[in-house]
Amino acid sequence: MGRVTTPSEEDSNNGLPVQQPGTPNQRTRVPVSQFAPPNYQQANVNLSVGRPWSTGLFDCQADQANAVLTTIVPCVTFGQIAEVMDEGEMTCPLGTFMYLLMMPALCSHWVMGSKYREKMRRKFNLVEAPYSDCASHVLCPCCSLCQEYRELKIRNLDPSLGWNGILAQGQGQYEREAPSFAPTNQYMSK
């Protein structure tokens, strides 16, 4: 334990207790986490939570036709992705036009691209990796669009079909899987 100081000792040292020579300097060790607010202690979580993407950001060779199309006209790929992600509310031509308009005019196509990438991540619970959504679309927009296109295609939401094509494909699959029932107008006879 520490030594008790008298008021005269504290006054001579500007109100601080005086350490007597020959006595050990005793300090109590208190964990830093005691001083941290409770929210801070819980906020230290892994931000890369979610499922991994089905393909990597730079796996453009996985769908070569889309890679070529995206390299030449990335606005078309964006329009296809936007139509599927908005469930048909934004048509492919409208999405294509908006992306095409933003590319040269404002050089801010990455804003729309990163917003739709974030929307896709949230919808499918995907991890924000290897880069943030914004960085992916600023540094390699074509690779980002290709990865998003492949992700939708792997999830049976082929952007090349458009939203109505996806619905029609789903309806056809439902009709093939529907159980067959006996005709309704059969009667028993005596």
Curated annotation (Swiss-Prot):
The record, for Pfam families, names: PLAC8
Kindly provide the name given to this protein in its UniProt entry: Protein PLANT CADMIUM RESISTANCE 8
Subcellular compartments? Cell membrane
According to its UniProt record, which protein family does this protein belong to?
Belongs to the cornifelin family.
Q: Where is the composition biased (Polar residues)?
A: 13-28
User: Can you list the disulfide-bonded cysteine pairs?
Assistant: none
Q: Spell out where the chain crosses the membrane.
A: 94-113
Sorted alphabetically, the Gene Ontology cellular component annotations on this record are: plasma membrane
Chain positions with Phosphothreonine modification:
23
Q: Does the keyword Transmembrane helix apply?
A: yes
GO BP annotation list: response to oxidative stress
Q: Which organism is it from?
A: Arabidopsis thaliana
